[in-house]
Amino acid sequence: MMIKLIVNADDFGLTEGTNYGIIDGHINGLVNSTTMMMNMPGTEHAVRLAKEYKTLGVGVHLVLTAGKPLLGDVPSLVSSDGLFHKQSVVWEGKVNPEEVEREWTAQIEKFLSYGLKPTHLDSHHHVHGLPILHDVLERLAATYNVPIRRCEEERAVRPFSDLFYSDFYADGVTEDYFVKLKERVQGEQTVEIMVHPAYIDPELVKRSSYVMDRVKELRILTESELPEGIELVKF
């Protein structure tokens, strides 16, 4: 009875330091999957690394709450400064799903334009869990034939795991996290754990409120060994 584990590093492309942390977490640790942000300063750098390290599964980290959209004509998605709304505004559901679909399609198409094939889709700040975006996700999953990170809601769209844990984060980043995993999971289940390893650079400090713990995450991800009965799997 093996537990199948996907350790997905979010925010590939956010900054170069983030990218290097994710690659280190893959080569020397438990990270076997990542998702790329297509509108960030480190995106091009992440693309080069994705092509170099082919053993790392790479999907698209759909963005609605950080940086600038790729499209210019998405008024419901941006504040007066032309940047995406803060997540609090998005969670109020004040975005036009049609504009979200066009912007997210542009983000996926940009990923494909580099000759990369996405393993799956997820989103920054988990906004794909918004009920008003459910149908958008269904269409994107069907169009691009990819699974999508499980949401807590019952109507998860084409989820690729039985369980999704987002608690390896901040105070939840503990030395024994992976050892204790067996107590939380039944038998043959597939589990995705969301992680955020990085090396700190000035751009990360500027763009994220979650900084110091990313280095701690990287250390634990590279020092931990999986207990017997848990294996890393690909999509």
Swiss-Prot record:
One term of GO molecular function: metal ion binding
Class of the enzyme per the UniProt entry, highest EC level: hydrolase
Cofactor(s), names only, from the UniProt record: Mg(2+)
Keywords: Carbohydrate metabolism, Hydrolase, Magnesium, Metal-binding
Gene3D superfamilies in the cross-refs: Glycoside hydrolase/deacetylase
Coiled coil ranges: none
GO terms under biological process: polysaccharide catabolic process
EC numbers for this chain: 3.5.1.-
UniProt: Mg(2+) binding residues: H61, H124
Pfam family for this entry, one: YdjC
PANTHER family: CARBOHYDRATE DEACETYLASE (PTHR31609:SF1), YDJC DEACETYLASE FAMILY MEMBER (PTHR31609)
Family of this protein: Belongs to the YdjC deacetylase family.
NCBIfam families, per the entry: PRK02134.1
Main function: Probably catalyzes the deacetylation of acetylated carbohydrates an important step in the degradation of oligosaccharides.
Protein name: Carbohydrate deacetylase
Originating organism: Bacillus cereus (strain 03BB102)
